[in-house]
Amino acid sequence: METTVARKRLEEMRDELDRSISVLQGTHPGPAAGLGYPQDSADAGSSLSESDRTEAVLLAARSQRDGVLAALARLEANSYGQCVDCGHQIPAARLDARPDAARCVDCQAKHAKRHR
């Protein structure tokens, strides 16, 4: 993938993630929120469950944003498209599908297996 195209796609991804994170933070109560007395225990359980789901989505969005920022840094360092583990070129089709990919398919599979 051409670096100018990659940069544009990564910047668009970063901007979209920033918007999503902002929305999630606006709907996600902080740790001190909701400390009043719930109307009943079912309401409290429902609220906690929704809060847990929102927190999980927020963590995933932040993690994905970190990956996008790392890819932008690799662009600046002229190492974009090289696997961070083995150093081989990441196939163009993979970068088209995942512009933020840091690893080739083989190394990503090994990484995922190690971090389960």
Name what the model sees in each region.
Residues D85-C86, D106:
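Short, cysteine/histidine-rich loop/knuckle motifs that typically chelate Zn2+
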Residues M1-A77, A97, H115-R116:
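Interaction interfaces in information-processing and related assembly proteins
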Residues D100-K110:
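Cysteine-rich micro-motifs
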Residues G81-V84, A102:
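Cys/His-enriched microdomains
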Residues P91, A112:
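Short functional micro-motifs and their immediate structural scaffolds
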